[in-house]
């Protein structure tokens, strides 16, 4: 066993002495040592209950003959970090999470590891760690929050963000506003729409590192506890069979994950995160290939923010397995891909059934014949930009309008709430990329402001930053190269005409090549916004959003 390095032989007597100090017995030391990475904390609603999940995981490990050892890692609540300087630290936390798990697993010789995430950056951070470590690993998430009920209809966190704009526009009363605030998030769990956290938890099933049900079983259901026990039991089997992430995270597994992403209409952040996980696994997924997947995989689900349904509705409709089963009918999946069940993806989904055809459409009658995410290219996005096409109003799929340029999210929000943005405009928010932000902040506040004020069907927003999975509208992010790296988004001026054609996968500023070159020659790189601490180091080492915003090779 791998853990023999810390527990076997005369030379390891000091190590055993320390293990005895934990209360471990000789029998427990004979068994596989399984790390349990728990991101429980008391600031994220999606993580407040993870101690219960961890206890269930450890019970499962013990039942199967393993010895669990729990440790913690950090987690940021993107909703609480949103709209202020705290969001600069969210994406960077992904790297810290991956690094911290690597450190713990390597320092203590774990035979296998169970990863317990739930929210936005914690899920990909843990998946990156699994790929990097390549020891038997399984992910069991905390599960989604139930949807709220606001004035008789379902609501969620995106409803609250949009309510801010609606209140400022006089569309709702203060009483209605505060009722939404208090009722939108009724339970623990990851926010209830097909936002980043839930998208990634669902994709974990398609990648093969999560058990069926991982993406959709609600956080407050006893079924989630049973799933955690099963994950604990399964990791011991994976150790015994030496099934590791490198056998699971193949090119085919990532194609399966992106295919599910398109069918679900998932968050644009998945492009960033799946590319980062693939990087750790040594798998190359060019952005152009993601467009190819989108062209052939239909959008089968309209979940919040694109529609009225929530993750609990997807669960009752058959869950991720039912969506995958529907895709398999058209030969859109690699069904022979290995998973942590020890079986193939095809074997996992063979008995799945769709129980609600409005939540999960048939392959013959999709919401859209193409996938929910598109990669755009053009003279302001030579390395690509990302849009959640499934959440864009039909009238905004093609749009041309004058640029309204802002060098920070705060400037843009002030202009939107100040009534300075008109129908037809294209809001450009730059110097918010991985290096420029730094940290590639999510622009949920400005997009929600536009939606709440009724402008989401008339105004587009482009940025080298990111968008929350709760964003809807013509919101085009991850523009690469970013402004801080001399990307052409840096030289756009107020009034320049921006041309967006999502079906054709194009985004351009209507300027001649000569004018662009002239402006670029006069451009000067601004000073970094943060000059000390972790984000200063992050700024130096992070790569382009088009590469997943991973650290450069040989970096930190």
Swiss-Prot record:
Q: Which GO terms describe its molecular function?
A: 2 iron, 2 sulfur cluster binding; dihydroxy-acid dehydratase activity; magnesium ion binding
Q: Which chain regions cross the lipid bilayer? A: none
Catalyzed reaction equations: (2R)-2,3-dihydroxy-3-methylbutanoate = 3-methyl-2-oxobutanoate + H2O; (2R,3R)-2,3-dihydroxy-3-methylpentanoate = (S)-3-methyl-2-oxopentanoate + H2O
Positions that bind Mg(2+): 78, 120-121, 442
Functional description taken from the UniProt entry: Functions in the biosynthesis of branched-chain amino acids. Catalyzes the dehydration of (2R,3R)-2,3-dihydroxy-3-methylpentanoate (2,3-dihydroxy-3-methylvalerate) into 2-oxo-3-methylpentanoate (2-oxo-3-methylvalerate) and of (2R)-2,3-dihydroxy-3-methylbutanoate (2,3-dihydroxyisovalerate) into 2-oxo-3-methylbutanoate (2-oxoisovalerate), the penultimate precursor to L-isoleucine and L-valine, respectively.
The record's annotation in PANTHER family points to: D-XYLONATE DEHYDRATASE, D-XYLONATE DEHYDRATASE YAGF-RELATED
Protein keywords: 2Fe-2S, Amino-acid biosynthesis, Branched-chain amino acid biosynthesis, Iron, Iron-sulfur, Lyase, Magnesium, Metal-binding
State the protein's name: Dihydroxy-acid dehydratase
* Pathway the protein acts in: Amino-acid biosynthesis; L-isoleucine biosynthesis; L-isoleucine from 2-oxobutanoate: step 3/4; Amino-acid biosynthesis; L-valine biosynthesis; L-valine from pyruvate: step 3/4
Its cellular-component GO annotations read: cytosol
| UniProt family annotation | Belongs to the IlvD/Edd family.
- Which top class of enzyme applies to this chain? lyase
User: Which residues does UniProt mark as catalytic?
Assistant: 468 (proton acceptor)
Record EC number = 4.2.1.9
Q: Which domain of life is it from?
A: Bacteria
The prosthetic group or cofactor this protein requires is: [2Fe-2S] cluster; Mg(2+)
Print the organism lineage: Bacteria, Bacillati, Bacillota, Clostridia, Thermoanaerobacterales
Q: How does it assemble?
A: Homodimer.
Q: Which PROSITE patterns match?
A: ILVD_EDD_1 (PS00886), ILVD_EDD_2 (PS00887)
Q: Which residues bind [2Fe-2S] cluster?
A: 119, 191
| Cofactor remark from the record | Binds 1 [2Fe-2S] cluster per subunit. This cluster acts as a Lewis acid cofactor.
Which GO terms are recorded in the biological process aspect for this UniProt protein?
isoleucine biosynthetic process; L-valine biosynthetic process
Record PTM N6-carboxylysine, positions in chain:
121
The answer to whether the entry has keyword Iron-sulfur is: yes
């Amino acid at each position: 066993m791998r853990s023999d390095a810390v527990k076997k032989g005369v030379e390891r007597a000091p190590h055993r002495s320390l293990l005895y100090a934990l209360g471990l017995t000789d029998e427990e030391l004979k068994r596989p040592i399984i790390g349990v990475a728990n991101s429980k904390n008391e600031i994220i609603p999606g993580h407040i209950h993870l101690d219960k999940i961890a206890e269930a995981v450890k019970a499962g490990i013990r039942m199967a003959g393993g010895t669990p050892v729990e440790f913690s890692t950090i987690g940021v609540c993107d909703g609480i970090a949103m709209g202020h300087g705290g969001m600069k630290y969210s994406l960077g936390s992904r790297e810290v999470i991956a690094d911290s798990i690597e450190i713990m697993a390597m320092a203590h010789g774990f035979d296998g590891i169970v990863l317990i995430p739930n929210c936005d950056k914690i899920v990909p951070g843990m998946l990156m760690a699994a790929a990097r470590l390549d020891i038997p690993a399984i992910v069991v998430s905390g599960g989604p929050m139930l949807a709220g009920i606001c004035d008789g209809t379902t609501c969620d966190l995106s409803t609250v963000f949009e309510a801010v704009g609606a209140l400022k526009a006089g569309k709702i009363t203060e009483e209605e506003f505060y009722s939404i605030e208090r009722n939108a998030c009724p339970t623990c769990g990851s926010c209830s729409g097909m936002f980043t956290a839930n998208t990634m938890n669902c994709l974990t099933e398609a990648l093969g590192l999560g058990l069926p049900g991982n993406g959709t079983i609600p956080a407050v259901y006893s079924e989630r506890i049973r799933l955690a026990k099963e994950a604990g039991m399964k990791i011991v089997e994976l150790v015994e069979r030496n099934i590791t992430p490198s056998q699971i995270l193949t090119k085919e597994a990532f194609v399966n994950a992106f295919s599910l992403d398109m069918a679900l209409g998932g968050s644009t952040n998945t492009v960033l995160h799946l590319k980062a996980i693939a990087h750790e696994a040594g798998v190359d997924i060019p952005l152009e290939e993601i467009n190819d997947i989108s062209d052939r995989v239909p959008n089968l689900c309209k979940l919040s923010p694109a529609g009225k349904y929530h993750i609990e509705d997807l669960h009752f409709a058959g869950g991720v397995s039912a969506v995958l089963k529907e895709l398999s009918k058209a030969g859109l999946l690699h069904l022979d891909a290995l998973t942590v069940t020890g079986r193939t993806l095809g074997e996992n989904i063979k008995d799945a059934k769709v129980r609600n055809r409005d939540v999960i459409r048939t392959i013959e009658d999709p919401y859209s014949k193409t996938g929910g995410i598109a990669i755009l290219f053009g003279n302001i996005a030579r390395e690509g930009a990302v849009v959640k096409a499934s959440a864009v109003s039909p009238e905004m799929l093609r749009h041309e309008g004058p640029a309204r340029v802002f060098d920070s999210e705060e400037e843009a929000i002030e202009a939107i709430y100040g009534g300075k943005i008109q129908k037809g405009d294209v809001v450009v928010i730059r110097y918010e990329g991985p290096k420029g932000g730094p940290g590639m902040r999510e622009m949920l506040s400005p997009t929600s402001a536009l939606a709440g004020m009724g402008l989401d069907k008339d105004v587009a927003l482009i940025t080298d930053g990111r968008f929350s999975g709760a964003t809807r509208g013509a919101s085009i992010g991850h523009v690469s190269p970013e402004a801080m790296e001399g990307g052409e988004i840096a030289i756009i001026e107020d009034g320049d005409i921006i041309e967006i054609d999502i079906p054709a996968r194009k985004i351009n500023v209507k300027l001649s090549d000569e004018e662009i070159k002239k402006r670029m020659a006069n451009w000067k790189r601004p000073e970094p916004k943060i000059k000390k601490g972790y984000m200063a180091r992050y700024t130096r080492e992070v790569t382009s959003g088009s590469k997943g915003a991973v650290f450069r090779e040989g970096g930190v």
